[in-house]
């Protein structure tokens, strides 16, 4: 269907571009004067078969228009050697081209490069591929002069394919080659991607551990400072959101951590107190955020009434209490507990003590075992540093 459509389009274009018959007469006479090709009549191509004229007509069209017509019709073009229409071969991309390098060194000289064996995990095929690549090239070394670059994957050494060979064996082959080394390398970005992926997983695991330690410290702080045992973990997310809102709105002049802000009531930074309402069992945390330098308030004026004779023996600290040392802003967060605030204080204290004694050890054991399981999926990290990276 596609070839028929293209033939019709070609005939229409020829009909519109053809001149008048008077102007076409000399061409026809010249065609009659030209000798006919010798040969049997059966050698002529049938009118319906695609030939050189058809391919010439197809090459006149723009490739984008031709591909669009093929996509709409669902047809394909007949293949022919030497045809101008070929699909791009992405397997021969520049980053997958191999190159052969010859390194020459002196008797008391090294080649000047370091190799490392890494494991690439293919999720689709559920397998791990061990790849040996160049991780470092020294300055003004035979390796740099030969054109070896960091990131080159070593495919063969002295004509020997090193696929599936262990790291130590590859090092022995290179050391036994003498002063002349012939390497076949393959450059690609898969090694760099694998390194970044492994580092990303490690940072995610570290962040998970630090976040767990941070929440554990917040639990201990609430228990030690306020005497509270909060079972709902969403309270810490609420406190974090309030703190971020205060920082974003500019209410807090300094970016202080949340731990010093929830200090003891007598500290210079600020204090915290717990208040319990009469009609509601919710818990209110009020945090006072003070400035960096405490500013003393002016003393209150003395009372106007006359003092009796017994007031002479009263200490001055009772009559004139000390002013507050800092000007502070307060932010209250209402966190309703699931079970109310009417529990026995002895049971709460016992539960908090058990959490403080057992929670940290269990949490550390869990994180350590999770990290050990994570390292099992990275074969390059399970081996020793001597086997993983070698200087040549």
UniProtKB/Swiss-Prot annotation:
It is a peripheral membrane protein. Residues 37-49 have a biased composition (Pro residues). Residues 180-257 are annotated as: Interaction with PSCD3. The modification Phosphoserine is found at residues 93, 384. This is General receptor for phosphoinositides 1-associated scaffold protein. The modification Omega-N-methylarginine is found at residue 269. GO terms for cellular component: cytoplasm; glutamatergic synapse; nuclear envelope lumen; perinuclear region of cytoplasm; plasma membrane; postsynaptic density; postsynaptic membrane. PANTHER family: GENERAL RECEPTOR FOR PHOSPHOINOSITIDES 1-ASSOCIATED SCAFFOLD PROTEIN-RELATED (PTHR15963), PROTEIN TAMALIN (PTHR15963:SF3). Transmembrane segments: none annotated. CDD domains: PDZ_tamalin_CYTIP-like (cd06713). Heteromer. Composed of TAMALIN, CYTH2 and at least one GRM1. Also interacts with GRM2, GRM3 and GRM5. Interacts with CYTH3. SMART domains: PDZ. It comes from the Eukaryota. The lineage of its organism: Eukaryota, Metazoa, Chordata, Craniata, Vertebrata. Signal peptide: none annotated. Residues 1-50, 294-315 are annotated as: Disordered. Plays a role in intracellular trafficking and contributes to the macromolecular organization of group 1 metabotropic glutamate receptors (mGluRs) at synapses. GO terms for biological process: intracellular protein transport; regulation of postsynaptic neurotransmitter receptor internalization; signal transduction. It is found in: Cytoplasm, Perinuclear region; Cell membrane; Postsynaptic cell membrane. Its main location: cytoplasm. PROSITE patterns: PDZ (PS50106). Residues 100-189 form the PDZ domain.
């Amino acid at each position: 269907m596609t070839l028929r459509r293209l033939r019709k389009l070609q005939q229409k274009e020829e009909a519109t571009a053809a001149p008048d018959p008077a102007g076409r007469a000399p061409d026809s006479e010249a065609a009659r004067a030209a000798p006919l090709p010798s040969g049997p009549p059966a050698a002529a191509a049938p009118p319906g078969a695609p030939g050189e004229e058809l391919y010439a007509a197809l090459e006149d069209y723009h490739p984008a228009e031709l591909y669009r017509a093929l996509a709409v019709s669902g047809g394909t073009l007949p293949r022919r050697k030497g045809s101008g229409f070929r699909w791009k071969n992405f397997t021969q991309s520049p980053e997958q081209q191999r190159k052969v390098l010859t390194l020459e060194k002196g008797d008391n000289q090294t080649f000047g490069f370091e190799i490392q064996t890494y494991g690439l995990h293919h999720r689709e095929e559920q397998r791990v591929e061990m790849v040996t690549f160049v991780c470092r090239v020294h300055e003004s070394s035979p390796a740099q002069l030969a054109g070896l670059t960091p990131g080159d994957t070593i495919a063969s050494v002295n004509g020997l394919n090193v696929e599936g060979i262990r790291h130590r064996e590859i090092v022995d082959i290179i050391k036994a080659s003498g002063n002349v080394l012939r390497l076949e390398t393959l450059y690609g970005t898969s090694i760099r991607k694998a390194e970044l992926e492994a580092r990303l997983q490690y940072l995610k695991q570290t962040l998970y551990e630090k976040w767990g330690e941070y929440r554990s410290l917040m639990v201990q702080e609430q228990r030690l400072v306020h005497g509270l045992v909060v079972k709902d973990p969403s309270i810490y997310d609420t406190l974090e959101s309030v703190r971020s809102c205060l920082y974003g709105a500019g209410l807090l002049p300094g970016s202080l951590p949340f731990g010093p802000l929830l200090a003891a009531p007598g500290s210079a930074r600020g204090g915290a107190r717990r208040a319990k309402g009469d009609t509601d069992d919710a818990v209110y945390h009020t945090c006072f955020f003070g400035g960096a330098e405490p500013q003393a308030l002016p003393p209150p004026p003395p009372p106007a009434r006359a003092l009796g004779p017994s007031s002479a023996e009263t200490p001055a600290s009772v009559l004139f209490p000390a002013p507050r040392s800092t000007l502070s802003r307060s932010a209250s967060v209402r966190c309703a507990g699931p079970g109310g605030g009417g529990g026995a204080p002895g049971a709460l204290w016992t539960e908090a003590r058990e959490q403080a004694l057992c929670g940290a050890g269990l949490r550390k054991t869990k994180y350590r075992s999770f990290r050990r399981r994570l390292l099992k999926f990275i074969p390059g990290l399970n081996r020793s540093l001597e086997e993983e990276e070698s200087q040549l």
